């Protein structure tokens, strides 16, 4: 069964100032699931309490790649376990050179194994650039698919913006997709999304 939630980045203008109040607002709107885009220094126990008092479940987090480096991953795991979150999504990385690509893929592979051992799935959220061929000849999304076990969080608008059909993309990658971001954009992108339910 499909579960729908809200990416808290959508409320980025207010979450940093009042994360607790933002969660109440989201719950009052009728959402049951939230994907965090930062905790702004709040303790895990506080976030857990705010989720509980609003009847919300953390479906995932957008977490910077520094948090999955060997020196930081234990604390990251502890925080996610404390708030009951089983999905950690990397929202982007620096893919500007072939060397950085190799470093990133190695980091994703190492972190994915460690997180999986702790009951947490690692995913990667695309923007348009991951679907475009780099100057060094690689298409990042295809490298992630072929060379890691990381799951995918497909952002339908950014995929469309890169010239792909989001519906066809989601169908092709359905066995690797953990989460889908349904996002509006220019009108032609919105019309394209009406063709199917990714």
Please give the residue ranges for each predicted region:
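Helix C-cap/helix->beta junction micro-motif
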Residues: 53-54, 83, 111, 115-118, ...
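Active-site beta-loop-alpha junctions enriched in small/polar residues
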Residues: 7-11, 37-39, 63-66, 92-95, ...
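Surface-exposed, active-site-proximal loop segments in enzymatic domains
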Residues: 69-74, 92-103, 192-198
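Charged helix-capping and loop-helix junction motifs
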Residues: 20-21, 71-76, 101-109, 136-142, ...
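Glycine/Thr-rich phosphate-binding loops of Rossmann-like dinucleotide-binding domains
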Residues: 14, 44, 98, 132, ...
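Active-site groove signature of glycoside hydrolases
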Residues: 82-100, 118-128
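Acidic/histidine-rich catalytic cores of soluble enzymes
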Residues: 117-198
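N-terminal pre-domain/capping segments
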Residues: 1-86, 151
